């Protein structure tokens, strides 16, 4: 019974730690990474994993790379005090 409670608690903790999602952002310009092939996209998957680690995923959503399974402190679009090339 104690083992079952520990397993349940661990699964709940993992779900909260890896819950963040968001657009991949260029930290210098404040712009989202653009993509044109909507849905599963090798470019977005590769860029998300490069920036956030192997555990993350990525696909093209609304012409921007959307990253999934991020850690809570991951930086995603929009950046505070930074607009995309003044737009």
From Swiss-Prot:
Changing residue 83 to A: Has little effect on the binding affinity to rat sodium channels. Changing residue 72 to A: Has little effect on the binding affinity to rat sodium channels. Belongs to the long (4 C-C) scorpion toxin superfamily. Sodium channel inhibitor family. Beta subfamily. Changing residue 42 to A: Has little effect on the binding affinity to rat sodium channels. It comes from Centruroides suffusus. The keyword Signal applies. The modification Asparagine amide is found at residue 85. InterPro entries: LCN-type_CS_alpha_beta_dom, Scorpion_toxin-like, Scorpion_toxin-like_sf, Scorpion_toxinL. Keywords: Amidation, Disulfide bond, Ion channel impairing toxin, Neurotoxin, Secreted, Signal, Toxin, Voltage-gated sodium channel impairing toxin. Changing residue 77 to A: 87-fold decrease in binding affinity to rat sodium channels. Disulfide bonds join 31-84, 35-60, 44-65, 48-67. This is Beta-mammal toxin Css4. It is found in: Secreted.
């Amino acid at each position: 019974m104690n083992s079952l409670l520990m397993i349940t608690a661990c699964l709940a903790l993992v779900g909260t730690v890896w819950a963040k999602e968001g657009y991949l952002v260029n930290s210098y310009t404040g712009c989202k990474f653009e993509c044109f092939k909507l849905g599963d996209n090798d470019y977005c998957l590769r860029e998300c994993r490069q920036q956030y680690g192997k555990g993350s995923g990525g696909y093209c959503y609304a012409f921007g790379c959307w990253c999934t399974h991020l850690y809570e402190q991951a930086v995603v679009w929009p950046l505070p005090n930074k607009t995309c090339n003044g737009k």
